[in-house]
Amino acid sequence: MSLLDLVLLLLVLGLGGVLLLRRKGEDRSAQEARELLEAARREAREVLEAARKEARDILEAARQEAKALRQEAEARAKAQREEVEAELRRRLEAAEAEAKKRLEEAGERLKAEREELRAERERLRSLQEELKEERERLKAEREELRREGERLAKRAEALDARAARLEEAEAELVRKEEALKAEARALEERLKEVERRLYEVAGLTPEEARRLVLERLDRELEEEKAQRVRAALERARLEARREAQKILAQAMQRQASETAAQLAVTVVPIPSDAMKGRIIGREGRNIRAFEALTGVDLIIDDTPDAVLLSSFNPIRREIARMALEELLKDGRIHPSRIEEVVEKAKQEMKTFIYERGEEAALEAGVVGLKPGLIQLLGRLHFRSSYGQNVLKHSIQVAHLAGIMAAELGLDAALARRAGLLHDIGKSVDREVEGSHVEIGIALARRFGEPKEVVDAIAHHHDPDNAETLYAVLVAAADALSAARPGARRESLEEYLQRLEALERIALSFPGVETAFAVQAGREVRVIVKPEKISDAKATLLAREIASRIEKEMNYPGQVQVTVVRETRAVEYAR
């Protein structure tokens, strides 16, 4: 029962009491009314208390029920929330997986697009490089065409001037011819007069008189003819000299390449001075192995952050430089590693030499050379003659010979080829017996070069015996290249020749595998074959080599001969 029901009940009871009092009449007294009212009040209070108690019970029950409902609702809500959260997590995980998958797919697509873009960029860069090279080539061709046009214009002017001179000479010849005709007529008149006088004075017959006159005229004409021939020869000699000087001047003006005198020492930078100890190795084993394998002196002194490589042979020195730089870069320096790196450097040197040969042929404008000849040509990069780099000298001779051949109307390409190959014998003259001319002739014939090239190689030092004009042109170009101030130096060449002679003497003995002239020619290290030279024979060999050097060479100070005999036993653990 609710509180409203209790209030209504009290009102009904009150009204009932009032109505009861009215029906029973007025006879009841006020005391009874009050008693009734008091009883009604007590009853009402009891009812009210009961109602309140019941209300409290109901309220408590309602609270308990509400609490239970709330707990149930909370449990259901929690379950629903957990279910919703689980569903959300599932959907979120699915969405994340889908997003991750799409991201991966997008990443793959992006990576592929990036690779395509990089490839496209590389292709564009390559195209730009090709375009740049093409522009440079076209620019060079335009410049060459411009120079060729100028040269042709100058040549046309020279030809016009020569034609004018020829016309003047022709007019002079016509005048001289008229004068000669006049002289002939005068001579005829004189002859008739002489005949008449002879007839009158000497009483000679006409035949005798004619014979005497003709003999006299023959003598006079012979003298005049000899004088004219001498004058014509002198004019031709002067004209040829002027033309030759003009051709040489044009060739020298159009060819002005640099000269480079090679040295016998190479400086190799090192990261720090602490690296010098690692290069030397324990008890000097690293430096000994390096010098024995390369034939180059490795000089370690007080020079900060640098070591020196000394050798008269530029190829050995370059191989040593490449090997040392690789060892410094790698950091592992020990005899077996040194042997491996030196062998690798030798292989790389072969490629480098071939590339230098190709570049030289391209620069000289010579095509169609065989690979073996290109390899030999590249070796000239490391060859010097009186301090002048032979490869640069050969390129210069090729250009000069080509220019002079073009001026003379000869095959400029063939002249350039002959000029480029005229010193090819110097590429192997240290390994093969014979002069560089003889070696060059043999190499040119071996590789099937034209006879003009062979003739130029054979006679570029004695053009008087040449069979073709190309040998004369090459000889002139060779003299021009070598005669320029500063192009050659005598002292360095003599020094290199002395070192080569030391090695050649050591290599001439049987059982010698290789020999190196080191310490600026103060020491010769001879590596012998251990199966042919014993320890006792090694001592005798050193004495024989020293005696031969004393007899055949002139040198300052003394030369130490060191014979090295090494025996190796190698086995592999498997």
Curated annotation (Swiss-Prot):
Q: Where is the HD domain?
A: 390-483
According to its UniProt entry, the function of this protein is described as:
Endoribonuclease that initiates mRNA decay.
Q: Which family does it belong to?
A: Belongs to the RNase Y family.
Q: What is this protein called?
A: Ribonuclease Y
- Show the CDD domains listed in the entry: ATP-synt_Fo_b, HDc, KH-I_RNaseY
Q: Kindly give the membrane topology term recorded for this protein.
A: Single-pass membrane protein
Q: Where is it located?
A: Cell membrane
Q: Does the keyword Transmembrane apply?
A: yes
Q: What is its EC number?
A: 3.1.-.-
Keyword check for Cell membrane: yes
Molecular-function GO terms, alphabetical: RNA binding; RNA endonuclease activity
* Keywords per UniProt: Cell membrane, Endonuclease, Hydrolase, Membrane, Nuclease, RNA-binding, Transmembrane, Transmembrane helix
Q: Which GO terms describe its cellular component?
A: plasma membrane
Gene name of the record: rny
Q: Which residues form the KH domain?
A: 264-327
Q: Which domain of life is it from?
A: Bacteria
* InterPro entries for the chain: HD/PDEase_dom, HD_domain, HDIG_dom, KH_dom, KH_dom_type_1, KH_dom_type_1_sf, Ribonuclease_Y, RNase_Y_N
A GO BP entry: mRNA catabolic process
Q: Which residues cross the membrane?
A: 1-21
